[in-house]
Amino acid sequence: MNRGNQQKSAHVTTRRLLDMKEKGEKISVLTAYDFTTARILDRAGVDVILVGDSASNVFSGHNTTLPITIDEMIYHAKAVVRGVQAETSRAMVVIDMPFMSYQLSSEEALRNAGKIMKEHECDAVKMEGGRIVADTVKRITDVGIPVMGHLGLMPQSIYKYGSYRVRAQEGREAEQLLEDAKLIEQAGAFAVVLEKIPSKLAEEVTAQLTIPTIGIGAGSSCDGQVLVINDILGLNREFRPRFVRRYAELDAIIDGAVRQYVDDVKSGNFPSPDESY
């Protein structure tokens, strides 16, 4: 893959992620939806940038991830890939396949995965589901498209489950999740996201898989962690889930900066002579 960049750096690949798991080196994953954020994340050393269907929530303001379309996802992915290419080109870029872009049939899933890979230089696609998508994962990986799986809380199934509660807390559900993880691995997935499941279960899944597990609300035993960039930066004052650690409070900082700008414009304090031609 030709990635023009300013500072050449070893690009993270699926093989590299497997090596990281084998060596016990944790994998860092964050979401991005635009050029500027992707540049910063790549520069800061994030291993994997996920172009998440969470863009439906944090970028477009929808209540769920369901409304976002494949063309909208491709739009975001193109911007993210350009951002990575503008920096070190190190980060792997993975794009979520949106709701109903892969559920109808393996043929349609393959066609849409191919469309995603052809229209921008991302590295892989991500799909939610266990045994129900295993055949589709195999079909897609067989033609050379890397697939990341996603188990536990699956936001695209929110109307089926009715809430964002922790998943797989009961014995049979936990057993099924472990079985699903193994099926996804056997189908050819190179990694799997485990979202909002008990830490002990995530630890067991991680131990039994040879592919990396990426946790979100799944404890510290996973091979890596993923969070939504808006959440760690504190861009939503009202959203404070237990599994998110905030590293900044940008909502308040941006609010203060904008208010100062408005005041300076209203008072005539901006622009100053030094800011004029």
Curated annotation (Swiss-Prot):
GO CC aspect terms: cytoplasm
Name of the top EC class for this enzyme: transferase
Parts forming coiled coils: none
Residues annotated as signal peptide: none
Reactions it catalyzes: 3-methyl-2-oxobutanoate + (6R)-5,10-methylene-5,6,7,8-tetrahydrofolate + H2O = 2-dehydropantoate + (6S)-5,6,7,8-tetrahydrofolate
EC code(s) of this entry: 2.1.2.11
Pfam families linked to this entry: Pantoate_transf (PF02548)
Principal location class: cytoplasm
InterPro entries: Pantoate_hydroxy_MeTrfase, Pyrv/PenolPyrv_kinase-like_dom, Pyrv_kinase-like_dom_sf
Binding-site residues for Mg(2+), renumbered to this chain: 53, 96, 128
Cofactor notes: Binds 1 Mg(2+) ion per subunit.
GO terms assigned for molecular function: 3-methyl-2-oxobutanoate hydroxymethyltransferase activity; magnesium ion binding
Assigned keywords, A-Z: Cytoplasm, Magnesium, Metal-binding, Pantothenate biosynthesis, Transferase
Residues binding 3-methyl-2-oxobutanoate, per UniProt: 53-54, 96, 126
Gene3D superfamilies (alphabetical): Phosphoenolpyruvate-binding domains
Domain of life: Bacteria
Annotated GO biological process: pantothenate biosynthetic process
The protein's assembly and partners: Homodecamer; pentamer of dimers.
Role summary: Catalyzes the reversible reaction in which hydroxymethyl group from 5,10-methylenetetrahydrofolate is transferred onto alpha-ketoisovalerate to form ketopantoate.
The name this protein goes by in its record: 3-methyl-2-oxobutanoate hydroxymethyltransferase
Gene: panB
